[in-house]
């Protein structure tokens, strides 16, 4: 099953692309830090200082200003995430497609909804940062 989330951001596609792959940008809207620039074949460590948590992603594919594909977890397990960028006039449509959900999981719907919430939140933070310079939205979501 696929989880698809899209958002329109009023910034050029190259600016949006750099926000994902440049470690100096990611802390303004998503993770606290990224261990290095996202490049095909690399394993990148992402950290959330606020939650004392970190994880690794494997960068599967990069097409400059068009697409970033990565896997959360091991190469054989976990979720495959494709972030596609589509230029539209003076804006960029960001599309996040997450695959790898277990269709037989009793918590399938809850997992999809939780992850969808996360992608919508990340894209909202990205939009606020790139369009208005607001970098205080990140890590402000309260669950529970």
Language-model features, listed with the residues they occupy:
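Short, solvent-exposed secondary-structure boundary/capping segments
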Residues: 66-73, 92
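Signature tryptophan residues that serve as conserved aromatic anchors
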Residues: 29-30, 72, 119
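Non-transmembrane alpha-helical segments in soluble domains
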Residues: 17, 120-123, 127
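Hydrophobic/aromatic beta-strand elements that line small-molecule binding cavities or substrate pockets
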Residues: 7, 56-61, 80-87
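A generic beta-sheet turn/junction motif
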Residues: 9-11, 50-52, 63, 74-76, ...
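Short, highly charged C-terminal tails/helix-capping segments
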Residues: 128-144
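Short beta-edge strand/loop motif at the mouth of beta-sheet-based domains
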Residues: 4-5, 11, 15, 21-56, ...
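Beta-strand/loop substructures that line and gate deep hydrophobic ligand-binding cavities in soluble
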Residues: 75-121, 137-139
């Amino acid at each position: 099953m696929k989880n698809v989330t899209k958002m329109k951001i009023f910034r050029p596609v190259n600016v949006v692309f750099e926000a994902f792959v440049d470690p100096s940008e990611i802390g303004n809207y998503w993770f606290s830090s990224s261990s290095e620039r996202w490049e095909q074949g690399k394993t990148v460590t992402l950290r959330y200082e606020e939650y004392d948590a970190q994880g690794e992603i494997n960068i599967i594919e990069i097409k400059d200003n068009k697409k970033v594909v990565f896997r959360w977890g091991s190469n054989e397990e976990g979720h495959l995430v494709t972030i596609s960028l589509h230029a539209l006039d003076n804006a960029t449509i960001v599309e996040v497609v997450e695959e790898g959900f277990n269709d037989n999981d009793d918590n399938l719907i809850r997992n999809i909804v939780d992850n969808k919430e996360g992608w919508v939140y990340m894209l909202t933070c990205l939009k606020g940062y790139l369009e208005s310079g607001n970098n205080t939205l990140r890590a402000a979501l309260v669950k529970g």
